[in-house]
Every structure is written in C-alpha cells, then in structure tokens.
Amino acid sequence: MITIKDVEHISWLASIRVSEEEREELVAQFNTILDYFQQLDEVDTEGVEPTYRVVDLANVFREDVPRDSLTQDEALRNAPRREEGYFRSPRIV
C-alpha cells in the first residue's frame, strides 16, 4: 500500500512539487493501480505460453537496397566548415 510518505519520496525522485491535496489524490490513484496489479496476479495463467507482444509484427522497415546518393561535393556544398573532403566540426571537450 502506498502512503503519503511514498508519494513524497516519489515526487522528490522526480524533482516535482506536489501539493498536499495532490499527494492525497496520488495515494488513491497509486493504490488503485496496485489493486489492478493484484487482480492480474490472481489470473490463472497455467498452460498459457508467455509472449512478449500480442500482435505478430513482421519487419516493418523498407528493404535495404543500395541506391544512388549524394556525391562528396554535393554533401559538402553547404557545410560551414570542411577540410580535406570531410565535414569539420568545432572541438568538443
């Protein structure tokens, strides 16, 4: 069971301010959520094969087919800085 102290700790971890009224409301909401989990714990799953997703998805990405791309000159055309055919970026240290 979630208490006001738990909500205060969670809000501290999340770096958010929660009013007293909101704390009480959050206690009720968290406990309702935990009650739902308790109901799920009571479901008989004997003989049910574990699954990671309920929808059978196939690879939704496009085929990896080689195709023409920009030339080096086209890629570097709008680069603010370049050196020896490469993009030049400021030092980041």
UniProtKB/Swiss-Prot annotation:
Source species, domain of life: Archaea
Catalytic activity annotation: L-glutamyl-tRNA(Gln) + L-glutamine + ATP + H2O = L-glutaminyl-tRNA(Gln) + L-glutamate + ADP + phosphate + H(+); L-aspartyl-tRNA(Asn) + L-glutamine + ATP + H2O = L-asparaginyl-tRNA(Asn) + L-glutamate + ADP + phosphate + 2 H(+)
Enzyme Commission (EC) number: 6.3.5.-
Single Gene Ontology MF annotation: ATP binding
Listed Pfam families: GatC
Alphabetical list of SUPFAM superfamilies matching this protein: Glu-tRNAGln amidotransferase C subunit
Coiled coil: none
UniProt-listed InterPro entries: Asp/Glu-ADT_sf_sub_c, GatC
GO terms for biological process, alphabetical: glutaminyl-tRNAGln biosynthesis via transamidation; regulation of translational fidelity; translation
Alphabetic keyword roster: ATP-binding, Ligase, Nucleotide-binding, Protein biosynthesis
Family listed: Belongs to the GatC family.
Main function: Allows the formation of correctly charged Asn-tRNA(Asn) or Gln-tRNA(Gln) through the transamidation of misacylated Asp-tRNA(Asn) or Glu-tRNA(Gln) in organisms which lack either or both of asparaginyl-tRNA or glutaminyl-tRNA synthetases. The reaction takes place in the presence of glutamine and ATP through an activated phospho-Asp-tRNA(Asn) or phospho-Glu-tRNA(Gln).
SUBUNIT field: Heterotrimer of A, B and C subunits.
Protein name, as recorded: Aspartyl/glutamyl-tRNA(Asn/Gln) amidotransferase subunit C
Native species: Methanothrix thermoacetophila (strain DSM 6194 / JCM 14653 / NBRC 101360 / PT)
